[in-house]
Amino acid sequence: MKLSVNDLNVFVNTPKDIAKLCEDLSRLGLEVESCIPCIAPKNVVVGKVLEKAPHKNAEKLSVCQVDVGKEVLQIVCGAKNVAPNQFAPVALKGAIIGSTTIAKTELRGVESHGMICSSTELGFPKINDGILELDESVGELVLGKGLNEYAPFNTHVLEISLTPNRGDCLSVLGIAREISAFYHTPLKPIKALNFTPKSDSIALHADENIESHLAYYLIYNHSLKTPLNIKLSLAHNNALSENDLNNFIEFSTHFSGVILNAYGLNTTPVDLIIKNDENNLESVYINHQKRSTIAIKHQDQKDLSEHLLLEASYIDPISLSLKLHALKDKTLQKDNALIYRSARGSNPNLSDGLNFLSTHLKATILESKQTKHSLKDRTLTFQLEDITEILGLAIEEEKIQGILKNLGFKVSIKEPNSKPQILEVVAPNFRHDIKTIQDIAEEILRFVGIDNLISKPLNCVSSKNSNPHYDTHRFFENLKHKALACGFKEVIHYVFYSKEKQQKLGFEVLEDPLELQNPITTELNTLRTSLICGLLDASLRNKNLGFKSIALYEKGSVYNSKREEIQKLGFLISGLQKKESYPYAKGKAWDFYSFAECVSKVIGDFSLEKLTTQIPINHPYQSAKIIQNHEVIGVIAKIHPKVIQELDLFESYYAEIDASKLKRPAMLLKPFSIYPSSVRDLTLIIDENTAFSKIKKALKDAQIPNLSEILPLDIFKESDNTIALSVRCVIHSLEKTLNDEEVNSAVQKALEILEKEFNARLKG
C-alpha cells in the first residue's frame, strides 16, 4: 500500500524525522519497502495566468502573461489546457526541472521568462494532460509563494508491505492508529455529522440470513470536481480515475478503510432490498433491479442522477473467503481490488466512511438507513504470567495495559481481589486478527521490541519414541539391501520341508511327538530346521535354467527339535564369482575367504573358529563357527563334494546365522592418529594346532603400548608338528611419531608374550 506522510497528517501528527518513522513502522511489523521524497523543486512558485494569446509563429504554442507575485512574466507555453485566471506552478529562472535549468530563452522569435509546469515535470505522478492546475485544496494560494511550502508538494510517499492478517492497516486511518499508539500522540477522529432527516424515501429490507452490515446516506447530487489534494493522494496510490464520483469514493475508502459505494437514483421513493443472488452471494437490489454484489462487484459510477445513495458495507472476511472458495469454479463478475480489501478485513465502523465521504462531497444528507446488525465483542482473559511465559520476558502490568489501551483495546481487571490478577481484554472491532492470547502477546512484543527479548537457548528434551518392532524391521531391511548390493538375490521358501532330506544332510529334525500330524505332502512333511535345504533346491533350479553364477539370500523362520521358532539368515553361493568375461576367460571361481568377506559386508566384521562337530553337508577342512561380539552366531562352510555330486550342483558355499544374535551396531566415535604408523612383519615358528584367534587375544589382553593391530599374512608347513605363520604388527601412537626404539620395544614385548604363551619363536 502507498500513502504520503501528508495523508497521515490528516489523522495524526507524524514526526519530522521521516527515516526514524520508517524504521519504527518496520519494527511494528508494517515493513516500509520504500520511502520516496516528493518535493517540488526550488524556484517553483504559485503563478496566475492573466492573459493567453496565440503565438505568432507557432499554432501549438501560446504566449501567456503570468503573475508570480513580484512581477508579471511572459511565458511561452505549449499546453492545451492553459487558460486565463488559472493558478499554476511556475518555474522561475534558475529552477532545475529534471535535467534542465530554466533560463530566459526565445521560442520561435518570442521571449519566454520561465515555464508553466505539469505534475510529472515537477516529479509528481501524472494528474492530467497539460499543466497542473492549482486550487485552494492544497492551501491558500499566494502568488509568488514557493510550491514546496505547501504540504502536498513537500512530502514523502511510503510503500508499506502488509501481512494478510493486517487488513485494518489497508487504510491511512489504520496506519495512523499505529503511529498514534507508538508515539503516544492523539488520533484525530473522523468527525460525526449531525443532521436532521428531511425525507422518508428509502424502504430498506434485508433477508434474515444476510451476514453483511450495511449503512446508507441519501444525498442530493450536484456537480462534482475532484480537488487537487484528492487527485495527488490517489495518484500516489495509482488509483486516480477520470470519474469524479469514483475519485471521491476511492479517496474516502483509502483514508477510512470502509468499503464505500454509490448508486444514482432518478426517482424516489425506492425499495432497497438486500438478498442472496443466484450464486448465493449477498447483493443489493433497488426497485427489484440488481445493482451490486456486496464486497465483490460494484457498478460503474455515474454521477448524472438527481440523488445519490451512498453505501458503506462490511462483511466478515472469513465468511467471504469461504463463499469465494466454494464458487472458485464459477465465472463471476468481480473486482479484485474490492475483494482484496474485503477479504482481509475492512473497517466495520461504517459511519466513519459515510461521514468522511459526505464531508468531502459537501453534501446535504436527506436520510440515513442501516441494517440491523451488531458485531460481537471478542473478549480474552489472561494472567500476566501467561504473557511472560509466551515472550520469555517479564513486563509490568501498567505497561501492558498502556500498550493495549493505546491500540484501542478495552482493558479491565476481571477479579480485582484475585491473585494473580486476571486481565479481561476486549479487542477493537477493526482488529480481525486478534483471536487468542498469543495474538495479544504479539501486540505487546511489537511495541516492546523484539530486540529487547533476552536470547536464551531452547531447552528441548526429546524422548526416544522408537518402536522396537519397527527398529528390528528396519535393521533387517538394511541387511537385505546390503546383501542385494553384494549381488545376492532374495528368495522365499515354505517353512515345510522333507524330513528325510534334512536328516540326510545332517540337520536336526523335530522330535517325533512334535511332528506334523497331517502334512500337505510327503515332500513337505515337517517343519524346516535350516534355511540351507531350500537354498540348495533353489540353486539347483537356477543351474538347470542355465545360470552359472548363483548367489542367494533368505531370511525366515526355522524350528529346533523342540519346535521353537527361530529367525535365521541364510546365504548360499554356487558356481562362478565372476562370469566368463575379460580378464577372466573361464570365469573366476569362489573360494572360502571371498565368500566370508561377502557375508561380512552384510552382517559386519566377525572372526572364525574351527567347528567342533561336523555334519555331512560340511566340508571337513573348510567350515567354521562365526564369532561376533564374543558369541557364536552361525556357521559358514563349503558344501561337501559328495553332496555336490549327489545333488548335481556347482561348487557351493553357505552361511547360516541366528538373526536374534545379530546386534544393531551403536555409532561409536573413535580417535584416529594424525601421525604415521609403522609395520613389522614377523614369521613365527609355532605349533600347528594353535589358532590365530588365540594369538590375537593374547596380544590384545597384554595391552602392549602402541600396538594397535595384528594381522595374519601367510602360513606354510614347517615340520611335522609346526607351521611358519607370518603376521604383521601395526604400531602407531595418537600423540607423536614413534622412533625406532619405541617400535622395536613394542615388537619385542609381543615376541616375549608369544614365546611365553605359545612357545613361539622367530624363524631364523
Language model features with spans:
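RNA/tRNA-interacting regions in translation and RNA-turnover enzymes
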Residues: 1-472, 484, 577-578, 680
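A carboxyl-terminal module marker
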Residues: 2-5, 27, 406-408, 415, ...
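Beta-rich nucleic-acid/ligand-interaction surfaces
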Residues: 39-43, 253-254, 418, 422-426, ...
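Short, acidic/hydrophobic/Gly-rich beta-strand patch recurrent on exposed beta strands
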Residues: 62-69, 572, 599, 728-730
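Class II aminoacyl-tRNA synthetase-like tRNA-binding/catalytic domains
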Residues: 69, 86, 92, 102-105, ...
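Short beta-alpha connecting loops at secondary-structure transitions
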Residues: 337-343, 425-426, 461-467, 518-523, ...
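Mixed-charge, low-complexity segments
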Residues: 341, 366-369, 373-374, 573-575, ...
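His/Asp/Glu-rich mid-to-C-terminal helical/loop segments that flank catalytic regions of hydrolases
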Residues: 346-363, 538-542, 547-551, 744-749
